[in-house]
UniProtKB/Swiss-Prot annotation:
Annotated EC: 3.1.-.-
Region: Disordered, residue numbers: 86-111
Annotated Gene Ontology cellular component terms: plasma membrane
SMART domains: HDc (SM00471), KH (SM00322)
Name of this protein: Ribonuclease Y
InterPro entries tied to this protein: HD/PDEase_dom, HD_domain, HDIG_dom, KH_dom, KH_dom_type_1, KH_dom_type_1_sf, Ribonuclease_Y, RNase_Y_N
Domain HD: 336-429
Matching HAMAP family: RNase_Y
Source taxon at top rank: Bacteria
One Gene Ontology term from the biological process aspect of the record: mRNA catabolic process
Length: 520
């Protein structure tokens, strides 16, 4: 019973609690709904206020934009009106100018009409005068024909003949004067070019040498060089082809030979043997072979250095080595390599003055004597060998022709070939260039003066300009003007018959008459 009551009470309390909870939750929900509605109304009111503010702001901006556009439009309209006004003013000014020009043209047209009328009148007068002059000329021609018994055609032919003769003579005189002037100018220009080239090219004096000297540390070394029964010296002479001269010269051995390459090989080998101290046939063979290789390498270096100094590039390596061999070749005492470099410089300078290819000219000058490097090993003249080498190594045709023609064996086909021949003559013929040439030079001067002074009436003679000219002073009371010309011809013939000389020699006979009186 008691438990039932408590159960009922519990159920009742639970029911009451549920009802009370329902109403409490309902009141809370209604309160929240009312708060949310109030908040929504507040937010809506704020949004309306913001929208109204934005609307007002947009209206203000629109009004400002409209005001700005209106102001700009007014300014643009004002500018356009101003521009239109200026154009209108310019058009009015042009119209006024055209009106003035129209008036000026009308005035000029009137003036031209007046001048035309005047010209027509003068033309009529001229025609009348020409008619009268024609009649007078016809009358005069008729009268002249009657007086001279010649027709008009005959008189015309006579006059034309005289004019033609006079004109032909004048033309001949002018042509002769032009030829003389051209020759003088050409000679002058050639002398200027040659003198300029020679002044800009410095050359050394040379002397031929056929011996080399090897210094020894002491005279005892001479016996070691000779060896037992002379076997060392015989081996060295056999391998090098050079004669060793061991005499009383203190601490020196002389190497004699005409082949400079062999002589240089022997000198280097002997110098190495002396420094090494071991001198016997096997060691000599080793040193000679080593010296040959050193000389070959040095020859190649000399060839490369020469092409660099002269400014010639692109030569075949074999041709460079052959060029280096020229250092050990001489011609009448003149080193052929130095001579070739000198010719290259001179040819290049003259070619530059004439507007020719300076590099090609230097190349032709450098290679003009290339055949002399091996002319003692190959049959043929150095010109033929040089042409073969240049052709073999595909040198320029101008270079080949320059080699072939520099001694006059063939005709030169280019200006550069002529310049190479001239430079070769300049380098070889100058005093001091070649030892034999120096002796011949002095002998030629003496012979020139001897021939000149052998004639009667010659007072004194002078060989000048390195033997290129001889001036002869004659006695004026013995030799007259005609005799002076004859004397010059006779001396010229004797020089041609008795002397050998390059180029030509100018013979000048000077006859001077002086009248001197003294006032007391």
């Amino acid at each position: 019973m008691t438990s039932t009551v408590w159960i009922l009470i519990s159920i009742l309390l639970a029911t009451v609690g549920a009802v009370v909870g329902f109403f409490v939750r309902k009141s809370i929900a209604e309160a929240k709904i009312n708060g949310a509605a109030n908040e929504a109304r507040r937010i809506l009111d704020g949004a309306n206020r913001d929208a109204e503010a934005l609307k007002k702001e947009a209206l203000l901006e629109a009004k400002d934009e409209i005001h700005t556009l209106r102001t700009e439009a007014e300014l643009e309209i004002r500018d356009r009106r101003s521009e239109l006004q200026k154009q209108e003013n310019r058009l009015m000014q042009k119209e006024e100018n055209l009106d003035r020009k129209d008036e000026t043209l009308d005035k000029r047209e009137q003036q031209l009409e007046k001048k035309e009328e005047s010209l027509v009148a003068r033309q009529q007068q001229i025609e009348e005068l020409e008619s009268k002059v024609g009649e007078l000329v016809q009358k005069q021609q008729t009268e002249l024909e009657r007086i001279s018994n010649l027709t008009r055609e005959q008189a015309k032919a006579i006059i034309l003949g005289k004019v033609e003769s006079e004109v032909s003579h004048e033309i001949a005189v002018m042509v002769k004067e032009s030829e003389v002037r051209a020759k003088e100018e050409a000679d002058k220009k050639a002398k200027e070019i040659l003198s300029l080239a020679m002044q800009r090219c410095a050359a050394d004096h040379v002397a031929e040498t056929t011996v080399s000297v090897v210094n020894l540390p002491n005279d005892e070394m001479k016996g070691r060089i000779i060896g037992r029964e002379g076997r060392n010296i015989r081996t060295l002479e056999t391998l090098t082809g050079i004669d060793l001269i061991i005499d009383d010269t203190p601490e020196a051995v002389i190497l004699s030979g005409f082949d400079p390459i062999r002589r240089e090989t022997a000198r280097i080998a002997l110098d190495k043997l002396v420094q090494d101290g071991r001198i016997h046939p096997a060691r000599i063979e080793e040193m000679v072979e080593k010296s040959r290789r050193e000389v070959d390498e040095y020859i190649r270096e000399v060839g490369e250095q020469t092409t660099f100094e002269v400014g010639v590039h692109g030569l075949h390596p074999d041709l460079i080595k052959i060029l280096g061999r020229l250092k050990y070749r001489t011609s009448y005492g003149q080193n052929v390599l130095k001579h070739s470099m000198e010719v290259a410089y001179l040819t290049g300078l003259m070619a530059a003055e004439l507007g020719e290819d300076e590099k090609l000219a230097r190349r032709a000058g450098l290679l003009h004597d290339i055949g002399k490097a091996i002319d003692h090993e190959v049959e043929g003249s150095h010109v033929e060998i040089g042409v073969e080498l240049a052709t073999k190594y595909k040198e320029h045709p101008v270079v080949i022709n320059s080699i072939a023609s520099h001694h006059g064996d063939t005709e030169p086909t280019s200006i550069i070939a002529v310049l190479v021949a001239a430079a070769d003559a300049l380098s070889a013929a100058r005093p001091g260039a070649r030892s034999e040439t120096l002796e011949n030079y002095i002998r030629r001067l003496e012979k020139l003066e001897e021939i000149s002074e052998s004639y009667e009436g010659v007072e004194k003679s002078f060989a000048i300009q390195a033997g290129r000219e001889v001036r002869i002073l004659v006695k004026p009371d013995t030799i007259d003007d005609l005799e002076a010309h004859r004397l010059a011809r006779d001396i010229r013939k004797r020089i041609e018959n008795e002397l050998d000389y390059p180029g030509h020699i100018k013979v000048t006979v000077i006859r001077e008459t002086r009248a001197v009186e003294y006032a007391k």
